[in-house]
Every structure is written in structure tokens, then in C-alpha cells.
Amino acid sequence: DRDRFRIRSYGSSGLGRMNGEFIHAVYEYDRFVRSFPVGPSNPAFTPLDQISPYFRNAVLTSEDGSFFYHSGFNEDAFRKSIATNLKQGRFARGGSTISMQLIKNVFLTRKKTVARKAEEALIVWLIERNRITSKDRMFEVYLNIIELGPNVYGIGEAAPFYFSKRPADLSLN
């Protein structure tokens, strides 16, 4: 049965990489853009508890409202995405959760292929099922690497760039 399925070793895959500081490399259209450390050595890195709850909740609401309650996949969004994409004959609608977006950005490329999507799903399943990285840490990394404007990556860069504020000071005003 599936509860007995265990992976004894991940080899050199580095699936636990997000648990500590790591270098994140940004690529667009297979072209290297820049890299930066995700962790305390980066002055723009912002721990989760120092990010405004308004911003955290806005991201959760817009990207993946059930992030802290699912195991990496939102089946309803995935089904709707597949139906729309098949109907239109192209990748027109995404069904990615925050977990899936994070794995794509940290471990894979942005190419929209079935093979890449399968890799993404497998890595998400491995990390979530085996609790390799906590949900809080995954959300923290996500908020520190997502592109929030041209060459603006993570809330530590975005808050001062757009609002002249620290991430903790973001509000609804």
C-alpha cells in the first residue's frame, strides 16, 4: 500500500537545500539574470515573522489560499487548469500552488513542458510528503525570491522600492 512506500535516499538531489541559506539563480528565457543568497547574509532577506501579516495574507489570498492546508497540490485548481488548457490547446491557465511555484523557481526552469511539470509535481510530492522543508520555511523562501517587478526579487527588495518601507511596516494604508 502507498503508506509503506518510502524513499531511502535522495542521493545528491539537494532537496533539503531550502532548509538553510542557499544561492538562488534567476533565469528568464534560459538567460541568467542574477543570483543572490537566500538567508541572513543577504541584507534584503526577510524572516517570515518580519513580513507584514497584511502582505503575507494578500499573497496567500491571491496565489494559494489553502497553502497551509494542502500537501502541495490543489486538485480543483489543477483540474480547471487542465480543462482550460486542453480546450484552448495551449498553456493558458495555471493551476500551480505556492509549493509548485517555489519548486519551479528553486530547482527547475520556467519552461512550460509536460516533462518539466511532471518533475515539478514529483519534487513537490517528495518535499511535502516527507516534510523535508516546513510550510513556514517554504513560504518564507517564496516571499524572498518571487519576482515583484522588473529585477525586483522578494519582499525585502520590493517593500523599500515601491513603498519606502520595511517589509514589517507594510499596511493597508
Residue ranges of predicted features:
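Juxtamembrane regions of bacterial inner-membrane/periplasmic proteins
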Residues: D1-N173
